[in-house]
Regions:
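ABC transporter nucleotide-binding domains
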Residues: 3-8, 13-216
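Conserved NTP-handling cores and scaffolds of large molecular machines
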Residues: 106, 227, 231, 266, ...
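C-terminal coupling/interaction segments
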Residues: 281-327
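Preference for bulky hydrophobic residues occupying beta-strand positions
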Residues: 13, 26, 235-237, 280, ...
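ABC transporter nucleotide-binding domain
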Residues: 176-283
Length: 327
């Protein structure tokens, strides 16, 4: 059985009166992509910051490659690479100069550093832009240089905190492909995201985090068993008209994102607003669809289209919390 490279036990972090992380425990196995999936504000970045020794845990412990947190931050930092959510580059420097800066922070220099910079630029597909200033790069290219910086010192575990936020779809696909290639090359990755599809496409295992608690953990197949044979109806709404109509009918999402409009319909288990959509978990899509469509029409909702989906991680999150992932 594969051994864990990371073990977290009852990690907690409090900022004043706010308990951002509430005693989470999990492990990451060597050679896997482990995703922490949850909405913004769930505690993902705070967890990464504790595990990368940027902030001290209020309680609990962790171990990375045999090194203790708290207590052995120097060796932990040597064992990990970090790709932060915020781009950490100097726009006035070239890609190579930025990587030279980060390499020196890892006590790298001379020919070994120069060779390693060539290697990581090739990994992220930017060898031909090495001499260009970062200010000329797109958001996606900057993200890739951030990843290159995290790989410079050959870490045993790579933390990637929401690395595709705010970039175009093509750059996003390229980064996801890169993450898979890193795993296939033996890298262990702890990946945080609020995009359900990223967690589904990348992960060997997923931990679902919400309001500072780890509420579920397992493979995608294991997690979707939570909802059994449920299916999902995804109603795509026109933006302005639907929001106004929901409010006018008194059916606006509650504080936790739930929608009461479809309560009581045969086969409906739960419903929540997600962006400009309503996600309805049902026991059987074929049986529930006429009632859901009828109720939407009666309410005057502008439904542009309806998708029928098999159980996925968003359905699991909705089942466990009553809210959509992006509420």
């Amino acid at each position: 059985m594969t051994e864990p490279i990371l073990i977290a036990k009852e990690l907690r972090k409090t900022f004043g009166d706010n308990e951002a992380v509430k005693g989470i425990s999990f492990s990451v196995l060597r050679g896997e992509i482990f995703s922490l999936l949850g909405p913004n504000g769930a505690g993902k970045t705070t967890t990464i910051n504790m595990l990368s020794c940027l902030i001290e845990p209020t309680g609990g412990t962790a171990e990375i490659a045999g090194h203790a947190i708290p207590g052995d931050s120097l060796n932990v930092r040597r064992a990990i690479g970090v790709v932060p959510q915020e781009i950490a580059l100097y726009d006035s420097l070239t890609a190579r100069q930025n990587l030279e800066f980060w390499g020196r922070l890892y006590d790298m220099s001379g020919k070994p550093l120069a060779q390693r910079i060539d290697e990581v630029l090739a990994i992220v597909g930017l060898s031909d832009r090495a001499k260009d200033k970062v200010k000329t790069f797109s958001g996606g290219m900057k993200r890739r240089i951030n990843i290159a910086a995290g790989l410079l010192h050959r870490p045993r575990l790579l933390f990637m905190d929401e690395p595709t936020v705010g970039i175009d779809p093509q750059s996003r696909r390229r980064i996801l492909d890169m993450v898979r290639e890193l795993r296939d090359g033996g890298m262990t990755v702890l990946y945080t995201t609020h995009y359900m599809e990223e967690a589904e496409q990348l992960s060997d295992r997923v931990g679902i985090i919400d309001q500072g608690r780890l509420i579920a953990l397992g493979t995608q197949a294991e997690l979707t068993r939570v909802v059994g044979e449920q299916e999902t109806l995804r109603l795509h709404l026109s933006e302005e008209a639907s929001a106004a109509l929901l409010s006018a009918n008194g059916d606006a999402p509650t504080a936790d994102g739930q929608v009461a409009l479809f309560n009581g319909l045969p086969g409906v288990i739960s419903a929540a607003a997600v962006d400009h959509q309503i996600v309805v978990n049902v026991a059987d899509a074929g049986e529930a669809l006429p009632g859901v469509v009828g109720r939407a029409n009666d309410a005057g909702l502008h439904v542009r289209s309806i998708d029928i989906e098999e159980p996925n991680l968003e359905a699991v999150f909705l089942h466990l919390t009553g809210r959509g992932l992006r509420d």
